[in-house]
Amino acid sequence: MKTIIEPFRIKSVEPIRMTTREERARLLEAAGFNLFKLHSDDVIIDLLTDSGTSAMSAAQWGAVMTGDESYAGAPSFYRFEAAVKDLMDFTHIIPAHQGRAAEHLLFSLIAKTGDLIPSNTHFDTTRGNIEAMGAEALDLPIAEGRVPSLDHPFKGNMDLAALERVLTEEGGRIPAVMMTITNNAGGGQPVSLENIRGAARLAKAHGKAFYIDGCRFAENAWFIKLREEGQKDRSIKEIVRETFALADGMTMSAKKDAFANIGGWLALNNDALAERARTLLIQTEGFPTYGGLAGRDLDAIAQGLKEIIDEDYLRYRVRTNAYIAERLDAMGVPVVKPAGGHAVFIDARAFLPHIPPLEYPGQALTCAMYETGGIRACEIGTVMFGRKPDGTEAPGAMDLVRLAMPRRVYTQSHADYVVEVLEDVAATKDTLKGLRIVKEPPMMRHFTAAFERL
């Protein structure tokens, strides 16, 4: 059949509270034009993030009831550990309450002031945790990855020539190489298996550890199966296992490709580093067999990892975003091509060329989407990445707006509504104005900054 349907039936529902444009204008101003500060029940379609917002399955809710809450040695942990190792066979699996906690553990142990950590593109919390240690987070995407309108099968790839040059010239400052799959800040774009192999090979040749931020590993594996030569006949599980076999460790948010509402882990092969990580975990997260999580959450993650590699689900997941992107592109809204795995990314800089980057076109567009139709989206651009560690500001590499689709939550009619709202925004886009920041924290400002319209 030509139509790809949602490969699930809906067993439980939550009502959406409808709001008026007048209400939304008032709420937006009260929130300082920062959509993170809105109450979620004032949002009609919430595309702020796909992290922790998935609909859990009946099997996951059933697993919740089997959770054991023993402080140490709970069977929930061992079921969780086995499920992780079934896909990512690292020696040590260390649970944490979410991905950024796993990042904090890792970078607290391997990074120090003056260090440099290259990646295809670090996302916000990864960058924040690196910079919190006084180190520098360096992005090395391929050139194609910086051109939103360019169609390329693996725009999330790392520039391997640039990586080799940095490793040669700055090797003394580099404790490790990171790879983010998929490349979230670059538009949810996949990384090829060949590119992961190449980065791992270079890291090993220079005596550096190679770590993967694996938040959307299943979506990345699906793109590899679809697009990479020699991969179409392999299972998702086979591709996933090879991907992580190339790494010395990984950080993970189970709130993405494990369908969980909370949770994550740090996985390592280095025994000494794992021992230090567990000691730090006890100080900051909890005992190593729960890591700040309830046993029921560990069981929900274990079940979610079995479900995430289902090809019918992945086909539907990726096609949903492609459908929205194709409709937006057809009506002249510039989008990152091809569509990402977890989200559609709008090129706000191209959509609103009259708003300069330092007046935050991405933030202006997110505000317009909410005011027009109650859609909450996320700026991935100069607000998120424009502030430098020394306090100066420069335009981000791109100014994007991310429409992150929660897993198994919305239907095609919701997707059609999103397109219609953007059609209305496009009709009056020339009247939109930029913003200025009136209050911001010193780090990861996009979460709590306050704005005013110019």
Curated annotation (Swiss-Prot):
Q: Which sequence positions carry the modification called N6-(pyridoxal phosphate)lysine?
A: 256
**Pathways involved:** Amino-acid degradation; L-tryptophan degradation via pyruvate pathway; indole and pyruvate from L-tryptophan: step 1/1
Query: What are this entry's molecular-function GO terms?
Result: tryptophanase activity
Enzyme class comes to lyase
Name the chemical reaction catalysed here. Answer: L-tryptophan + H2O = indole + pyruvate + NH4(+)
Lineage: superkingdom: Bacteria
Q: Which UniProt keywords apply?
A: Lyase, Pyridoxal phosphate, Tryptophan catabolism
Necessary cofactors: pyridoxal 5'-phosphate
**Which Pfam families does the annotation name?**
Beta_elim_lyase (PF01212)
What Enzyme Commission number(s) does the record list for this chain?
Answer: 4.1.99.1
Q: Which PANTHER family match?
A: BETA-ELIMINATING LYASE-LIKE PROTEIN-RELATED, TRYPTOPHANASE
Q: Subunit structure of this entry?
A: Homotetramer.
| Record family assignment | Belongs to the beta-eliminating lyase family.
Please report the name of this protein according to its UniProt entry: Tryptophanase
Organismal lineage? Bacteria, Pseudomonadati, Pseudomonadota, Alphaproteobacteria, Hyphomonadales
